[in-house]
């Protein structure tokens, strides 16, 4: 009788990423241990002394995690490419090194998004044919469903062919992972008509309409995306997508401050989203919200 031996799954975590690192990252890793298989192992990258202090505060045994000590951190104020190349002992850079060498099976960080993009491009590498990877956000809609928004911050400037490709990537992800049959793909714009928008969106519209590899339903305006009536996938550049995402978060916080209790509004809480996958690369990379607790 032949048996298949499943190797131990090693998940890499940037312990220094996020506004409240390393405390909340280590605490989150300890919480995650309750939900992952016993044959999986968490590998934390960061200042070993700080990581172990948090572990001791929670009474965690010293062998709870594999810890890779690093001495540098790429901050939000750093230039992404320069910092990634110069801070060779940063938690992000070393984490990607381990991912490339196959020492971990996936890497997650709530740190600098720009540096994570650089690492995804040059360490994880893009899938053949992909121009630029993207990150997406799954946002709840009023009809009880959700839509996929991409890009939400990895590429603030996108050429028309990149937006067209995001339509294909988003469609494939929505179908394979979100189980949406023939997902409807729309381009976020200032009007529904094909001639609306700037030079980039006008050119992108033509490419998307002619693509034929996914179900393009045309332009969609921002006031329609939360209804769920028109699109399952909404495409935009990272500047616009991140603005939509932050506006959604701001609306949630404003509603809570006003004492509004509503099941739908609660679904807009970014704390409920552990992270989002980087789409279009040959590795499993997750980017978390920097403000997450």
Label each residue range with its predicted role:
Residues 99-117, 195-196, 201-268:
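Glycine-rich phosphate-binding loop
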Residues 60-104:
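Phosphate/nucleotide-donor binding subsite
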Residues 6-52:
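N-terminal phosphate-binding or glycine-rich loops at protein starts, especially the Walker A/P-loop
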Residues 121-145, 149, 227-293:
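Glycine-rich phosphate/nucleotide-binding loop
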Residues 13-23, 84, 154-164, 286-293:
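Short, glycine-rich nucleotide/cofactor-binding loops
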Residues 23-24, 36-43, 156-222, 232:
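Glycine-rich phosphate/diphosphate-binding loop of Rossmann-like nucleotide-binding domains
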Residues 21-25, 89-102, 106-120, 131-135, ...:
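Short glycine/serine/threonine-rich phosphate/pyrophosphate-binding segments
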């Amino acid at each position: 009788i032949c048996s298949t031996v499943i190797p131990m799954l090693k998940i890499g975590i940037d312990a220094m990423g996020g506004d409240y690192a390393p405390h909340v990252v280590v605490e989150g890793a300890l919480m995650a241990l309750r939900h992952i298989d016993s044959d999986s192992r968490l590998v934390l990258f960061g200042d070993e002394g700080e990581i172990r202090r948090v572990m001791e505060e929670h009474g965690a045994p010293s062998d709870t995690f594999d810890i890779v000590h690093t001495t540098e951190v790429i901050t939000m104020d750093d230039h992404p490419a320069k910092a990634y190349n110069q801070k060779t002992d940063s938690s992000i850079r070393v984490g990607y090194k381990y991912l490339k060498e196959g020492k971990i099976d996936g890497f997650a960080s709530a740190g600098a998004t720009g540096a994570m993009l650089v690492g995804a491009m040059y360490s994880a590498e893009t899938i053949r044919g992909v121009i630029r990877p993207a990150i997406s956000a799954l946002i709840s809609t009023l009809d009880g469903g959700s839509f996929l928004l991409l890009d939400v911050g990895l590429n603030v400037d996108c050429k028309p062919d990149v937006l067209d490709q995001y339509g294909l990537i988003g469609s494939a992800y929505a179908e394979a992972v979100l189980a949406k049959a023939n997902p409807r793909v729309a381009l976020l714009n200032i009007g529904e008509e094909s001639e609306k928008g700037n030079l980039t969106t006008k050119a992108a519209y033509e490419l998307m309409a002619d693509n034929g590899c996914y179900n393009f339903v045309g332009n969609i305006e921002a006031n329609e995306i939360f209804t769920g009536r028109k699109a399952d996938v909404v495409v935009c550049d990272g500047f616009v997508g991140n603005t939509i995402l932050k506006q959604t978060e701001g609306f949630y916080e404003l509603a809570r401050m006003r004492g509004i209790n509503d099941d739908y509004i609660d679904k807009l809480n970014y704390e409920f989203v552990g992270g989002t996958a980087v789409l279009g690369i040959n590795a499993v990379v997750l980017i978390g919200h920097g403000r997450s607790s």
